[in-house]
């Protein structure tokens, strides 16, 4: 009885009623069964929250995934997902259902992220006025449905990446927003690993859509990818 009461209070505090909760959960397919062979591998998924497809956030995440893959090429699989390719309605996080006949892409994305072979998730966003993009926020808000599914992202390793127009342009604030959402999912949040080892990957875009000249920023990107992979492998091995 106590657990049901606590859950009801949480949903009320989040602005989600019983009917709205059912609307959210009804859009999510059941988690697929995982094969024994798939369980031996660890998948790292990077999510680009930029509305500009294939630009600097995607490029930075690609570098992070390459660094993750290099940790153990035989066991690590990687995938980049760009939210710019998807239809996501952030209003559903507040329990506002889609119009009759409408669909969006979150249910398929939720199934992919919650799969047992996914050991790590890196979320990246450009910096917009010291915070993440509305697209990235809508995605993280929609992940409330995964929290409601017995914390489907729990114990997956999370990393955050931010690309700003100047060196100190709000990257760390953006990282903190992404990391806060991950912690609410019971994810294991890591930052960029040594030797930089601060709060995550912080990248500077000089305005020419070229981040390759940002040596320090790209080092944090590589360290983040490596660290996410290292911890995900340890988690998979039960260490």
Predicted segments, located by residue:
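N-terminal beta1-alpha1-beta2 submodule of the flavodoxin-like/Rossmannoid cofactor-binding fold
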Residues: 3-6, 11-149, 198-239
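Short, glycine-/small-residue-rich phosphate/pyrophosphate-handling segment
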Residues: 152-195
């Amino acid at each position: 009885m106590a657990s049901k009461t606590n859950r009801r209070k949480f949903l009320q505090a989040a602005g989600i009623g019983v009917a709205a909760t059912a609307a959210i959960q009804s859009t999510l397919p059941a988690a697929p069964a995982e094969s024994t062979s798939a369980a031996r591998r660890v998948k790292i998924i990077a999510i680009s929250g930029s509305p500009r497809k294939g630009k600097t956030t995607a490029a930075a995440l690609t570098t992070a995934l390459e660094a993750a893959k290099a940790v153990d090429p035989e066991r690590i699989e990687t995938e980049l997902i760009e939210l710019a390719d998807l239809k996501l309605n952030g209003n559903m996080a507040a329990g506002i259902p889609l119009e009759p006949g409408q669909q969006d892409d979150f249910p398929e994305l939720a199934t992919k992220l919650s799969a047992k072979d996914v050991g790590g998730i890196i979320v990246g966003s450009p910096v917009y006025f010291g915070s993440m993009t509305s697209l990235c926020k809508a995605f993280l808000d929609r992940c409330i449905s995964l929290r409601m599914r017995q914390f489907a992202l729990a114990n997956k390793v999370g990393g955050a990446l931010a690309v700003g127009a100047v060196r100190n342009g709000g990257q760390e604030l953006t990282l903190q927003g992404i990391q806060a959402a991950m912690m609410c999912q019971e994810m294991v949040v890591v930052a960029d690993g040594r030797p930089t080892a601060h709060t995550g990957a912080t990248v500077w875009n000089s305005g020419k859509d070229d981040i390759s000249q940002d040596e320090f920023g790209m080092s944090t990107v590589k360290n983040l990818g490596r660290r996410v992979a290292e911890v995900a492998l340890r988690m998979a091995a039960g260490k």
